[in-house]
Amino acid sequence: MAAAPGARLLRAACASVAFRGLDCRRLLVCGTRAGPAVPQWTPSPHTLAEAGPGRPLSVSARARSSSEDKVTVHFKNRDGETLTTKGKVGDSLLDVVIENNLDIDGFGACEGTLACSTCHLIFEDHIYEKLDAITDEENDMLDLAFGLTNRSRLGCQVCLTKAMDNMTVRVPEAVADVRQSVDMSKNS
């Protein structure tokens, strides 16, 4: 059975609310309606102030980025092949992989909801040093990632900036999805 239209957006919104330390039930308080529509939720000014600055939902980042500012990103996949593509400033690296249909097996299995570590990437030192601070939630997921390094981050939590133009990120040789067993094969 297919998910109702907007279900992915609702899951992402729930993850964003949880990411900011708020109670996810606030999104679902209005209950279900007849038909496939997802309930509307409008945050109060207090809720917005409580949320504070944080990484926007990937969907919001795309909507906000009205200009076509793009940066080039090089992904070194598990086979050692370099996949070069462009992404919009403000999009997450997970968005870039999905929107450009890059051949990275199993990447982003949870669709950016911080429920797995399949979008684990390893950054160059000079780029890693400039990334926003890592959250406790992301750190918890990274603890379960295969091939963790001191320059590891989740692609769903890193948004592109102009300073990242022409960066190279490496995909670890194996994937550890906390929802499943570890996949040690390069081409599963």
From Swiss-Prot:
Compartments reported by the entry: Mitochondrion matrix
Keywords: 2Fe-2S, Acetylation, Cholesterol metabolism, Electron transport, Iron, Iron-sulfur, Lipid metabolism, Metal-binding, Mitochondrion, Phosphoprotein, Steroid metabolism, Steroidogenesis, Sterol metabolism, Transit peptide, Transport
Residues where N6-acetyllysine is found: K70
Feature: transit peptide: 1-64
CDD domains: fer2
Chain positions with N6-succinyllysine modification: K70, K162
A GO biological-process term: cellular response to cAMP
Tissue distribution: Found in all tissues, most abundant in adrenals, ovaries and testes.
PROSITE patterns the record matches: 2FE2S_FER_2, ADX
Cofactor(s) of this protein: [2Fe-2S] cluster
Role: Essential for the synthesis of various steroid hormones. Participates in the reduction of mitochondrial cytochrome P450 for steroidogenesis. Transfers electrons from adrenodoxin reductase to CYP11A1, a cytochrome P450 that catalyzes cholesterol side-chain cleavage. Does not form a ternary complex with adrenodoxin reductase and CYP11A1 but shuttles between the two enzymes to transfer electrons.
Subunit structure: Interacts with CYP11A1.
Family label: Belongs to the adrenodoxin/putidaredoxin family.
Xref: PANTHER family: ADRENODOXIN, MITOCHONDRIAL, FERREDOXIN/ADRENODOXIN
Protein name: Adrenodoxin, mitochondrial
